[in-house]
Amino acid sequence: MKQFKQIWKWRHLILALPKIVWFNFHYLPFRQAIRLPILLYKPRFRHCKGSIRLQGNVHFGQIKFGFPNMSSYPDTGIIWDNMGGTMHITNGANISIGNASSVYIHNYGHVDFRGDFGATAAAKIICCHQIKFGKNVLIGWDNLITDCDFHALTHINNRGGNIAFAPISIGDNVWIGLQTITLKGTCLPSNVVVAARTILNKDYTPYGEYVLLGGSPARKLKDGICWNPESDYVDYIPINNNLL
C-alpha cells in the first residue's frame, strides 16, 4: 500500500517521463542529458527551439519545471515556448519554476540564471532580449517578468520610435513578493525585498542594498530590510481557544 501511494503521488511525473527524456536529450549533450537534470511536470511544448546550456555540477532533478504544485493555483504544469533563444544556467544552480507557469524565449532572447532560483507558482517569464537572475532569487506567486512591451510607442513630436525592449537584471538574495510585475529596464541590486503587487520599471541600484521596495511604480519604503534564504522559516503558533 505504501509503495502504491508513492507511485500515485508521482504519477504525473511518471507519465511525463517520455517527454522528460526527450527534452533532456534534445537540449543537452549526452553526458549531461543521461543524468536527467531537467524534470517536467505536465509539460506543454509550443516551440522547442534554441538552446539550454548548463555549467557547473549537473545532477538529477537539478531543474524543475512545473512543480512544486501549489493548491492555490490550477494544476496545469508548465508551458515551454522557446522560439530560438538561450537559457544559460551557471554555477550548478538549482532552478524551480512552479505549476501553472510559462516560459517564453524569443529568437534573440537570453535568460541567465547565475544561482539558485525559485518561482512558487503561476510565474510568467517572457524574454525577448535579456533577463539575468543572481544567486538565491525567490519569486512569489503570480509574477510577470517581461523585458519587452511587444508594442512601440511614438511621440507625436518625434519621428523616431520608442525602443520596446530593455534588459532586466536581478541581484543576489532577492525576494520578490506575489503578483509583482517586472518590466523592461528593471535593475535590482542584491539583498532587497520587493513588496507584493509592486510594479518594477527602472534602475533601483541608487537605493542601495538592504531596502524594501514597493508601490506602483516602486519606490523605497524602508531601509535595513533583507531576506536570508538560510533562515527562511515561519514558526506558526496555534490559536488559544480561551481567547476566542
Question: Would you name each region that the model predicts?
Answer:
Residues 150-151, 198-199, 205:
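Flexible glycine-rich beta->alpha loop in the catalytic core of nucleotide-sugar glycosyltransferases
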